[in-house]
From Swiss-Prot:
Region (Disordered): 91-117
Protein name as annotated: Putative hydrolase fragment YghX
GO molecular function: hydrolase activity
Annotated InterPro entries: AB_hydrolase_fold (IPR029058), Dienelactn_hydro (IPR002925), Dienelactone_hydrolase-like (IPR051049)
Organism: Escherichia coli (strain K12)
Coiled coil: none
Length: 117
């Protein structure tokens, strides 16, 4: 897969909705937490792996826009994993409570994120 093909997977397009279900047998998806690198609490992330991995597997960090780890970004991570990559989608809103379930509220929360954390 080329970098250009990966960029096509990452373009936001809410009209497409869910393309790869959480329960797809070709992937293993889970929510994880890990410590903030600067010691400011935990970061929530969505980790998705191909169900059948052997040896070293390339990985992609799926970075959301200003709305948080919304369902579209989760679907992008699942598509990346289905293409054979490990995908990690961290929630950049973790320090302010995480994705609120609404894109407009997510944009508002993005303004409250302390960039030094």
């Amino acid at each position: 897969m080329t970098a250009l093909a990966l960029f096509d997977l990452l373009k936001p397009n809410y009209a497409l909705a869910t393309q790869v279900e959480f329960t797809d047998p070709e992937i293993v998806a889970e929510y994880i937490t890990y410590p903030s690198p600067n010691g400011h609490g935990e970061v929530r992330g969505y980790l998705v792996k191909p169900a059948k991995m052997s040896g070293k597997t390339p990985a992609v960090v799926v970075v959301h826009e200003n709305r948080g780890l919304n369902p579209y970004i989760e679907d992008v991570a699942r598509r990346v994993a289905k293409a054979g990559y490990i995908a990690l989608a961290p929630d950049g809103l973790s320090s302010v409570g995480g994705y609120p379930g609404n894109d407009d509220k997510g944009r508002e929360l993005q303004q409250q994120v302390d960039p030094t954390n």
